[in-house]
Regions:
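Aromatic- and kink-enriched transmembrane "portal" helix at the membrane-lumen/periplasm boundary
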Residues: 29, 98, 113-121, 125-128, ...
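Specific aromatic-rich, kink-prone transmembrane helix
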Residues: 106, 134-137, 154-158, 162, ...
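Interfacial juxtamembrane loops and adjacent helix segments
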Residues: 47-96, 108-113
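Helix-to-loop transition at the C-terminal end of transmembrane segments
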Residues: 23-41, 58-61, 257-271
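Selective detector of the "anchor" transmembrane alpha-helix that sits immediately C-terminal
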Residues: 103, 122-140
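Perimembrane helix-loop-helix junctions
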Residues: 185-199, 207, 219-252
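Transmembrane-helix signature of polytopic, membrane-embedded enzymes
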Residues: 118, 135-158
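Start-transfer (signal-anchor) and selected internal transmembrane alpha helices
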Residues: 1-25, 30-32
Length: 271
């Protein structure tokens, strides 16, 4: 009972810290003024209907450029809502996988003809919150001190790096979330010396999500997978190794099936 109360109190503290951090981030999101060019492309590639670049078809060649050209590029028009095929098409003319853009398009589709920074910032706040939770779980695995586990989330959660990732309307906060989940599941397997169904499902989802978000995920995941494989083979746990490989392979293959352009971009033969 005492252990249960201690655990409960630690999660209450975690929730309180997370709420404060979200309020902290909302403050910076509210102050956001202006957009870096890549953020403009985020909206354009997500919402422009089968029209990846605004200068295509000579749209900017006229001496007088109508504001409607930019509005059409950055917002979802009526009749073009939830057209994820358009998002995927646009990304085949860009250099990133489509998940981030699909989420941005889905939210923008709920508000046709409207543009708001919050369409991109609210998802980032959600990714940030999930990242904080898994960072806390990682800290608990590394050191079994529930109070020590608060220091990493305080250090990262209020850092300028976190502020930049949340307020920058690109895919990097989403990528960080997938990497944190991926890392936690690997550390969990090593800590418990067994692989659970939950671990397999999470690794599958994180692999799919990470590869479907940014190719940097491969750079992050490869050394972790290599170490995990060596560790399992040295323990001669071939059943665990097989399940682990299958889980990651399904996640990776699923991303490629959903977006075959991944292979071209990873091999340098794409855009």
């Amino acid at each position: 009972m005492r252990k249960f109360l201690r655990e409960k109190s630690s999660y209450i503290i975690l929730i309180c810290i997370l709420l404060i951090q979200i309020i902290f981030m909302i403050f910076y999101c509210d102050m956001k003024k202006g957009y870096f060019v890549d953020e403009v492309w985020s909206y354009g590639l997500a919402n422009s209907y089968y029209h990846a670049q605004i200068w295509e078809d000579g749209a900017l060649d006229n001496p007088e450029i109508s504001p409607e050209i930019f509005k059409d590029y950055l917002t979802v028009n009526k009749g073009e809502t939830f057209k994820f095929g358009s998002v995927i098409y646009n990304q085949t003319h860009d250099s990133h996988p489509p998940l981030f853009y699909m989420v941005l398009h889905a939210i923008s589709s709920c508000f046709p003809g409207q543009f708001s920074k919050w369409f991109g910032l609210i998802p980032n706040l959600l990714y940030y919150a999930i990242t904080i939770v898994f960072l806390y779980k990682i800290s608990r695995l590394i050191k079994k001190d529930k109070y020590f586990a608060f220091f990493p989330i305080l250090f990262f959660g209020f850092s300028i790096a976190a502020v930049n990732m949340v307020t920058y309307i690109r895919m990097y906060m989403l990528l960080t979330m997938w990497c944190t989940i991926f890392a936690y599941e690997h550390l969990s397997i090593m800590a418990t010396r067994k692989i659970k169904k939950r671990n397999l499902i999470s690794i599958l989802i994180a692999t799919f999500g990470g590869l479907f978000t940014h190719y940097y995920f491969v750079i992050f995941a490869f050394p972790m997978v290599l170490v995990q494989m060596i560790w399992m083979i040295m323990r001669k746990d071939y059943k665990m190794t097989g399940m682990y490989v299958l889980s990651g392979a399904i996640g990776g293959a699923g991303a490629v099936v959903c977006y075959p352009t991944i292979l071209k971009n990873l091999t340098g033969t794409g855009v």
